[in-house]
Design a protein with these regions (language model features):
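Cytoplasmic helix-loop-helix junction between adjacent transmembrane helices
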Residues: 107-147
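Conserved MFS/SLC helix-loop-helix module at the cytosolic interface between two early adjacent transmembrane helices
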Residues: 62-98
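Structural signature of the two symmetry-related core transmembrane helices
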Residues: 78-92, 290-305
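Residue-level signature of mid-helix packing/kink "hotspots" within the transmembrane helices
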Residues: 29, 57-65, 149-150, 269-277, ...
Length: 412
């Protein structure tokens, strides 16, 4: 049986979104190398690098719920185009920031523009795929992300050895190219009345306009969803160490080169490219509770094992472990949110879900680097192990579906 065959049932609009994500991520190199850019090229302190990443995270927090609401009101596709165009332009401007205040300002603006893409893209994928195919759709989305990420950081590592400014120009160019793809692709969906195809953006926008204008206070009444968001926070803090404590540990303490770090970063993405979709297709019958608990546990074990690492082989082994956790946890968590969200509030639910990652981005990199400076890298990796275990236990205790949610999932 071909485990990839299930992707063939996904609507072509899902593939369009994933294509734009692929192009954008193929140039993603500024964020993975931002800590090294600030500390090596700009000769700024580790503390300021942590503050800069925190500012990015705060921008992400501010935009996530707003982007979700705008997606429900104005249409996901429109918000995605604006996000890519603005963030691409800001990347070209970033290298010209010549003082601390301007670096923080443009970082905040870039974060808001860039992170506005995620809630509408995830909401759109979940809506178009339907309940039966959401795990496959989100696995395809992550496949696109990681095919791109297998290119961006590797190329970025070699560009950084020549000039860090090249990272910004390359990243900005692919971001603008992704925006142009969203404009150029034929977004056409058959009308319900059978009157032939209609313009996809207007139909998607019309569908969004018909959605309820329920406030976030309605979403916050869903206690099961709030428990899930709370459970995700510890492991979300861990996921941002590869752009904070991990590059400092590998380059400064283990003496990897920037190019070596980029290649090592690609180990994660290559595994995901080869394994994630078949893995999630084979686990499609697993309950959310079991998949989420296993994924979080593997993430904690993988990062925690860095405490024993002193060379390339050990680093690769730990990446393999936490990558399997990532491949299980992230598609399952996105599918869970799509399943529990009422159709008219999918953007709002996804906005709060992505806001959790944004909160972790604001805290995790800064916290990881502060702990590393004060207590050493071993304390960071033991802390990541504890965070993974906390999320795993909480997910194992995740309240079961209500009958209403089960009926909603069955109806797609």
């Amino acid at each position: 049986m071909n485990p990839w065959r299930g992707l063939g049932v996904l609507p072509r609009e899902v593939w369009y979104v994933c294509l734009a994500i692929l192009v954008n991520r193929a140039g993603t190199m500024v964020l993975p190398f931002l800590t090294l850019y600030l500390t090596i090229d700009r000769r700024l302190s580790v503390s300021f690098a942590g503050i800069t990443l925190t500012v990015y995270g705060i921008g992400s927090i501010l935009i996530a719920p707003l982007a979700g609401r705008l997606s429900d009101r104005l249409g996901a596709l429109r918000i995605m185009k604006i996000s890519l165009f603005v963030s691409g332009l800001l990347l070209f401007i970033y290298p010209f920031a010549n003082n601390l205040a301007s670096i923080l300002t443009i970082t905040a603006a870039w974060a808001i523009a860039s992170e506005a893409f995620r809630p509408p893209s995830m909401s759109m994928i979940g809506d178009l795929a339907g309940a039966m195919h959401r795990k496959a759709a989100f696995a395809l989305c992550r496949l696109a992300i990681n095919v791109g990420m297998s290119i961006g950081p590797v190329v970025g590592g070699f560009l950084a050895m020549r000039s860090f400014k090249l990272l910004f120009y390359f990243d900005g160019s692919t971001t603008l190219l992704a925006a142009l793809l969203l404009v150029a692709l034929p977004w056409r969906i058959k009308s319900d009345a059978g009157s032939g195809p209609q313009n996809g953006e207007s139909q998607i926008g019309l569908h969004a306009a018909k959605k309820s204008s329920a406030l976030y206070s309605d979403v916050l009444k869903n206690r099961r969803f709030l428990y899930f968001l709370l459970a995700m926070i510890p492991v979300e803090l861990v996921f941002f160490q590869p752009i904070a404590a991990m590059p400092l540990f590998l380059v400064r303490d283990l003496h990897f080169t920037e190019a070596g770090y980029g290649v090592l970063f690609a180990v994660n993405t290559v595994i995901i490219i080869l394994v994630e979709v078949p893995l999630n297709m084979s686990m499609s019958s697993w309950s959310h509770r079991h998949a989420l608990a296993l994924g979080a546990a593997l993430v904690g074990i993988g990062f925690g094992a860095l405490v024993f690492v002193n060379g390339v082989v050990g680093a690769v082994a730990t990446i393999v472990i936490w990558t399997f956790g990532e491949m299980i946890l992230l598609p399952a968590s996105a599918a869970y949110v799509s399943d529990v969200a009422p159709p008219e509030q999918s953007g709002a639910y996804m906005g709060l879900y992505t806001m959790g990652f944004s909160l972790a981005f604001a805290i995790g990199p800064w916290l990881g680097m502060q702990v590393m400076e004060a207590l050493g890298p071993s304390a960071v990796w033991l802390g990541t192990f504890a965070c993974g275990c906390i999320t795993a236990i909480m997910m194992w205790l995740l309240p079961k579906r209500s009958n209403a949610v089960q009926q909603l999932e069955q109806n797609g």
